[in-house]
Amino acid sequence: MAKEKIRIRLKAYDHRILDQSAEKIVETAKRSGAKVSGPIPLPTERTVYTILRAVHKYKDSREQFEMRTHKRLIDIVNPTPQTVDSLMRLDLPSGVDIEIKL
């Protein structure tokens, strides 16, 4: 018999908000009696955008901007119905993207 598992993947641009959200999820799951592994930090995705500083010429003068996407992974093993219910009611910040797989 395979174990039931909920896999939660969090993404955010700000790592502080991401870590706070992960701690809320872990605390809520542990309070309801489920076994939690994580938060596991996944590799940070770094996207670099290069643009010209000038409008028409001066191609050698460029500026670079980067956007970092931080990720965390949380596994909840053998969740109870109370665990699922409490996770559904959990209020998280708006800057965090949550992906849940059952």
Curated annotation (Swiss-Prot):
It comes from the Bacteria. The keyword Ribonucleoprotein applies. One of its GO terms (cellular component) is ribosome. Pfam families: Ribosomal_S10 (PF00338). Part of the 30S ribosomal subunit. This is Small ribosomal subunit protein uS10. Belongs to the universal ribosomal protein uS10 family. Involved in the binding of tRNA to the ribosomes. One of its GO terms (molecular function) is tRNA binding. One of its GO terms (biological process) is translation. Keywords: Ribonucleoprotein, Ribosomal protein. It comes from Geobacillus sp. (strain WCH70). PANTHER family: 30S RIBOSOMAL PROTEIN S10 FAMILY MEMBER.
